């Protein structure tokens, strides 16, 4: 069986490595002319680390990032609402890791280049179309750098791993649109002294009044004890519908929301102001679709189930997709049947995560407290909600997203 993977991002590379591990030949076709270390931070939850450890990459990723020790939720006045241990500190068999997205991507890329060989991991291949029969699929590409057509590529099956704006998906869903909800985000990374434990994943404030997520991704980045700290602000802005993923953000558009957020554990406006770079883009997803598989073509990761980046789950779900699909293909059944079996196993699961990220994401804890207490500091949170109830809210998201402790073995 010859498998073509359209897209060399996290999902596509995880699939290539997993297929190679199962003895199934594949080729990766990535659009960019050259792969570089780009992006900001990403969190690898224990179920993602389970899959990456099975690929032999777990220890390397822990070394390159920072293993999260705890998660803490604060209101916008800096008061602690709830905290809990994370990853191995919570009894999971695998770590939870904050890491630079570019480091994660290059780790996967270099592993694929080493294991599959450079002739099977190709750049500068922009997808433009496909044809298929009941026996084969033919893919058409052009050079991203030069614009010239490339020779057609034939394969037994094709897997679309080309992201939230998937061109492959658009062939089957030509009227498919991103779902904008009027939430804008600004993201950056800042060199700073460690915050709290130095391994804490922090969420503060609600989207209605201004939310920020903060976690470290590189330790001792300068030899002087500073960390590279990733931060993401999320603010409700009705009517915001610009699909621009690489737009540079402007500090003056949002810093006023956080001007008073100077806590004894962190000066938030100072952290934001000292960022090396700020990116701005809207929070979007797409409604779950009934079908991913069309003959000898299927969708994976964000091409199949784009979701809000609110639960550190987008990459994790793509990586799990890769393992499930590789396992089905390795069973040796008819290839289109294997694609359908993969879809049956994953579509319902991921649809529930998409909806959970909309309705009850991890920071729902903060919103719930704001609903009970109001937009004001509290004297005794226990008068409004118990710690056990807060824990149940946190555990419910873990259950839906597939990383409850009992499910990660």
Positions of PLM-derived features:
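C-terminal helical "tail/cap" subdomain of flavin- and related membrane-associated enzymes
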Residues: 1, 63, 78, 311, ...
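Conserved N-terminal helical subregion
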Residues: 1-3, 20, 47-189, 238-241, ...
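Residues at the starts of beta-strands that form the adenosine-phosphate
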Residues: 2, 25, 228
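Conserved mid-domain beta->alpha element of the FAD-binding
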Residues: 8-23, 27-32, 159-160, 186, ...
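Conserved N-terminal glycine-rich FAD pyrophosphate-binding loop of Rossmann-like flavoproteins
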Residues: 33-51
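Active-site substrate-recognition segment that forms the wall
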Residues: 74, 200-241, 258-260, 283
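A short coil-to-beta-strand element that immediately follows conserved catalytic motifs
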Residues: 121, 180, 197-200, 263-281
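Flavin-binding catalytic cores
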Residues: 244-277, 335-336, 343-344
